[in-house]
Amino acid sequence: MARYTGPTWKISRRLGISLSGTGKELQKRPYPPGQHGPSQRRKLSEYGLQLQEKQKLRHMYGVNERQFRKTFEEAGKMPGKHGENFMILLESRLDNLVYRLGFARTRRQARQLVTHGHILVDGNRVNIPSYRVKPGQTISVREKSRNLQVIKEALELNNFVPDYLTLDAEKLEGTYTRLPERSELPSEINEALIVEFYSR
């Protein structure tokens, strides 16, 4: 299944989460597209709730179904809680950490920066958005790319870096210091529903 590249606002409204990170999609019309008001949101079945939760997380991180399922299966082989490990693996993606560091305004923009070769890991260019960053590794902007307007604008708007990352804004360099804890990951996701979905 290919990655969705259509209007994120429509998907955000359908799933009830902000994929842009701004929350603007939900401010004006906080109900699914095609409906004429919030009261018409239909009640979902148990399967529907599980599917919706899976789609929320998949679209949030911008991962296609094949990669999403592969990461889920990998998380199941790790010690600890399956759902929590799954979310930690998604959070450790290079494109996501570029976004978390504030080098991009959205994960989609971060993915483009990685794909176009603007991002280094431990000083080496990595152009694979799904690259899994390990604790202790550094993420930086390539010297020739440091004047890109999209990066400057993103850094100006960014006012929060998670505790599992450190950022040197002058050097445009950050370090993934440790794996995140569940309390530091998206609270609007119920990963237990996703585990149930794939266990059917």
Swiss-Prot record:
Task: List residues of the S4 RNA-binding domain.
Answer: 92-152
Q: Which Pfam families match?
A: Ribosomal_S4 (PF00163), S4 (PF01479)
InterPro entries reported in the protein's UniProt record: Ribosomal_uS4, Ribosomal_uS4_bac-type, Ribosomal_uS4_CS, Ribosomal_uS4_N, S4_RNA-bd, S4_RNA-bd_sf
**Gene Ontology terms: cellular component:** small ribosomal subunit
Q: Which GO terms describe its biological process?
A: ribosomal small subunit biogenesis; translation
Protein's job: One of the primary rRNA binding proteins, it binds directly to 16S rRNA where it nucleates assembly of the body of the 30S subunit. With S5 and S12 plays an important role in translational accuracy.
Name by which UniProt lists this protein: Small ribosomal subunit protein uS4
Q: What gene, per UniProt, encodes this protein?
A: rpsD
